[in-house]
Regions:
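Non-catalytic pre-domain segments flanking phosphatase-related domains
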Residues: 17-75, 81-132, 166-179, 454-464
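Intrinsically disordered, low-complexity boundary segments flanking structured domains
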Residues: 78-79, 219, 304-308
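A metal-dependent, Asp-based hydrolase signature
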Residues: 85, 92-94, 99-265
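Ordered hydrophobic segments in well-structured contexts
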Residues: 70-72, 221, 385
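C-terminal cap/substrate-recognition subdomain and adjoining C-terminal extension
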Residues: 35-43, 48-54, 62-64, 68, ...
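N-terminal secretory signal peptides that target proteins for export/translocation
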Residues: 1-16
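Generic structural signal for well-ordered beta-strand positions
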Residues: 80-81, 387
Length: 464
């Protein structure tokens, strides 16, 4: 992360321009008459937010020289309501769209752990407790793997292998609808969710530890092991299109038999039109736009293309979790070496080690995020705007600090960074932005998740 200001006498000319412009920005960034042609409007955003962003666009030459200005966005729950990795998980299971063989199931989803290996995330290796069954009895990773693999084997032999031509002598005698009525499918649906979400939560009490970040960023991508790049692109595009037409739901299923566990999913996606407007405005002002996502890079890139953002955010401007293919070009779920995990500190590393070099050492002038994994990236902004989607995270999360800054510096800028901080509310029932910094989980009660500054009353903008 960059320090605030270098001494002018030691600064290069481009840096000196940024330093000298800092004082001017505080006045222009929030001025209602900063530019006569400031017509920036992002759909469903508060007028206050639009004014602040519009004034940044109108005055960008005051804070950045040619080639220096750029913006960084998260993708999941920032550009869209919902998470493309989580919703594609539901879609994959609902369609039994897999490629890996049943004999590889346990080795794939053990994530490299065994009974004798351990770290702070899985202190007893595969004998670590993953969660509890419906009776409150502990379930180990080893048990969850073994039980889920048994159901997968039946589904693979009966439907998956013949449907995707994975073996030479298999013929399917059942349709997808028919196989989904079997006990094996119903149990697999619950168990695989219990297994993967259980693994994702195994952070040893430190979600920034190396093992926690690796597990969280790779556990769901293991579902696509064995797929070609074209199959992956088809899967994610089909999943997004299907989820856009679905209700926003979190269905929960329960398995029966020897392992009775609950497994939950999320389904349904919505695109935030205001983010597209913002990206278009940034590009029109000469500001390059980047996406830094914790989803697999191929997922974020395909999502952007599907929504027609390719001209604003070209493929080379999308950074996500990167994985190695095998010699046949098939997906492996093995992380690319010497490349940061694009969550938390890894997002900031993309900014400081890659993007700043491209943009003559300048930090970003705009960032938008929604959760803990975005905080470090959002903290790299200087002389610009930080726009936070308000998902009502409590003050145990670093993202709540950005809610508080939006309230504390409402109508002004933060002295140390010279940033304006915005809070974007949302209606979580229908998955849209609303013209407030407050958000609602039920369409009835609206709140800011901030206790200071009179509960952030200045950002309400609603007649409640």
């Amino acid at each position: 992360m960059r320090t605030e200001v270098m001494k002018c006498e030691a600064a290069e000319p481009s840096t000196m321009v940024r330093v000298l412009a800092a004082a001017a920005l505080s006045a222009t960034l929030l001025a209602s008459t900063a530019a006569a042609d400031n017509f920036f409007i992002a759909a469903e955003a508060p007028d206050y937010n639009n004014k602040v962003v519009g004034n940044l666009l109108a005055n960008i030459s005051s804070v950045r020289g040619p080639g220096e200005a750029y913006a960084v966005f998260d993708w999941d729950n920032t550009c869209m309501f919902g998470d493309i990795s989580y919703t594609s998980f539901y879609y994959q299971v609902d369609n039994l769209n897999f490629r890996f063989a049943p004999e590889d199931f346990e080795s794939i989803f053990s994530l490299g752990y065994n009974a004798s290996s351990s770290d702070i995330c899985l202190t007893n290796g595969t004998n670590s407790v993953l969660g509890q069954d419906v009776n409150g009895t502990d379930v180990t990773l080893a048990t969850a793997l073994s039980e889920t693999a048994q159901d997968y084997k039946v589904l693979y032999e009966s439907y998956i292998a013949p449907t995707y031509n994975l073996t030479s002598n298999s013929t399917s005698n059942v349709t997808l609808d028919e196989i989904k009525e079997t006990a094996e499918y119903l149990n697999f649906r619950a168990k695989i969710s219990f297994l993967l979400f259980g693994l994702e939560a195994m952070d040893g009490g430190d979600d920034h530890s190396q093992c926690a970040m690796k597990i969280a960023m790779t556990v769901f991508p293991h579902l696509i092991v064995g797929m070609t790049e074209d199959e992956l692109k088809t899967l994610i595009r089909s999943s997004i299109r299907w989820n856009l037409g679905q209700a926003l739901e979190e269905p929960t299923y329960t398995s029966t038999g020897d392992l009775a566990v609950e497994g939950s999913y999320t389904k349904g996606l919505r695109f935030f039109n205001g983010q597209e407007s913002t990206m278009r405005g940034l590009r029109a002002a000469g500001i390059d736009v980047y996406i830094i996502s914790a989803s697999p890079q191929i997922y974020a890139a395909e999502a952007g293309n599907l929504f027609g953002l390719g001209n604003m955010v070209p493929k080379d401007n999308v950074f996500g979790v990167r994985f190695k293919p095998d010699d046949a070009g098939l997906f492996t779920a093995e992380l690319v070496e010497n490349y940061p995990i694009t969550w938390g500190p890894g997002k900031a590393t993309i900014v400081t080690s890659i993007l700043e070099e491209i943009h003559q050492g300048a930090p970003p002038v705009y960032s938008s995020g929604d959760t803990t994994g975005d905080c470090e990236m959002m903290n790299t902004v200087r002389d610009g705007v930080v726009d936070t989607n308000n998902r009502l995270k409590d003050n145990s999360s670093c993202i709540n600090d950005f809610y508080q800054k939006a309230c504390e510096y409402f109508g002004t800028t933060e002295p140390i960074t010279n940033n304006a901080y915005l809070l974007q509310g949302q209606d979580q029932v229908i998955g849209t932005w609303i013209t407030s910094g407050f958000s609602t989980k039920d369409g009835v009660t609206y709140e800011s998740a901030v206790t200071a500054d009179n509960g952030c009353a200045a950002y309400q903008f609603l007649d409640l």
